[in-house]
């Protein structure tokens, strides 16, 4: 393995839950700062980075719908939660000298930029991190699908998903002690085995556009930069297992 990154432009999907840290709700600023430092390592190595952040640490549309809320309204609330997370991450990145722009799929001009694909590409070409907020801007679509969509639109070489575990397992390793860990999978493996990596539409988008999905532990300091060089512990999902 070399220290040179294998990818020139990547999208990092961060779940809202990952930003809770040890808490049960909300944004843990120490965790946000640590993720920001990991991103800076990649930027310093010459990688162009964009992000999609979930909102499950604040509000999850599916949970709201399950409790009787109209699904569309619940999803819009979840999208607004992602904007809060995006602003927190922007603040953390800029505090350590990484120029960052937030673009929202739901226009809110006094808070951040609207999503404009060509502008986002130019930002990354200038070395800025772009954080895509508010998912796709449409209800009934997850932030995983938004991540796959933005990765395709931005021409990313890979989609990285930072989770609480170091790859994809046959079952939740926190609940099933003998769960099998996979180093490599195909897109069809994920769909056929119903592995809980991303939803089917996100997997299909990545597959159709030949974008590998790399699942790694966001809780491991420096893990993001390591995975980009091929040295980190992760699961790679592509056409070739």
UniProtKB/Swiss-Prot annotation:
It is an enzyme of class 2 (transferase). Inhibited by UTP. One of its GO terms (molecular function) is ATP binding. It comes from the Bacteria. Belongs to the UMP kinase family. Homohexamer. Catalyzes the reversible phosphorylation of UMP to UDP. This is Uridylate kinase. It comes from Parvibaculum lavamentivorans (strain DS-1 / DSM 13023 / NCIMB 13966).
